[in-house]
Amino acid sequence: MTLNINIDNFQGPFDLLLHLIRKNKMDIYDIKIFDITNQYIQYLNEMKEMDLEITSEFIVMAATLIEIKSKYLLPKTKEEEEEKEESDPTKELVSKLVEYKKFKLAADFLKNRELDYGEVFSKKPEIIDDRTEDADNKDILKDITLLDMYKLFEKLMEMYRSRINTNNSLPDKIAPDIYKIEDKMDEISEIIKSNKEIYFSNIINKCSNKIEVVVTFLALLELIKLKDIKVYQSNNFKDIYIERVSAVE
């Protein structure tokens, strides 16, 4: 029988034994020691012919298998039969194989987990400072008059009304995109040239709809990628501060 051997596929003698057991469709608890020993020796001989280095672990396992096989072949006295029942070398080998199989399955599981999550990037947890005391609403509204609140409410309502779609009917034709990232990049660049620095909210407040806001934001990302501008944000959800690179440098 021709054997195709790759020693790298076996991480030790127990790995080779498990391969032979699977190949012969044997129960690990009912190993046919004669067949396994012969095939194991065949593997080692094939490795020699291929000039592969055979480690001492493989040779020790071969010697163990031959010893077990010889004990089955040689005639035994009654005392030896009783001694065999007490200390069966095959049982000891099977016990080690079972343990090795458990560790191999665990190693394969961990390897697959590494492959699955090797390209996954997780966000580090944020450290949220404990609030020592609750904010007092009176302090928050201390310098705000009723007129200020009314003006703020009117401003919010105006922003809300400007974004409502008043057209209840669907158009027969969908118009092509009127907003292009390249145009918005030029527009932002011109604004920065004049002002050197500006808040992102000042730009998007001029947008007429959500699509224009999205295109404007993508244009901002492209300018950052090209290193034409720098952006800063003091905290999460705060306004984005835009600054021209040349103004910094």
Curated annotation (Swiss-Prot):
GO cellular component annotations of the record: cytoplasm
Keywords in alphabetical order: Cell cycle, Cell division, Chromosome partition, Cytoplasm
Chief site of localization: cytoplasm
Subcellular location: Cytoplasm
Record GO biological process: cell division; chromosome segregation; DNA replication
Family annotation (Pfam families): SMC_ScpA
NCBIfam families reported for this sequence: PRK00104.1-3
Family to which this protein belongs: Belongs to the ScpA family.
Quaternary assembly: Component of a cohesin-like complex composed of ScpA, ScpB and the Smc homodimer, in which ScpA and ScpB bind to the head domain of Smc. The presence of the three proteins is required for the association of the complex with DNA.
Summary of the function given for this chain in its UniProt record: Participates in chromosomal partition during cell division. May act via the formation of a condensin-like complex containing Smc and ScpB that pull DNA away from mid-cell into both cell halves.
Name of the protein: Segregation and condensation protein A
Species for this entry: Clostridium acetobutylicum (strain ATCC 824 / DSM 792 / JCM 1419 / IAM 19013 / LMG 5710 / NBRC 13948 / NRRL B-527 / VKM B-1787 / 2291 / W)
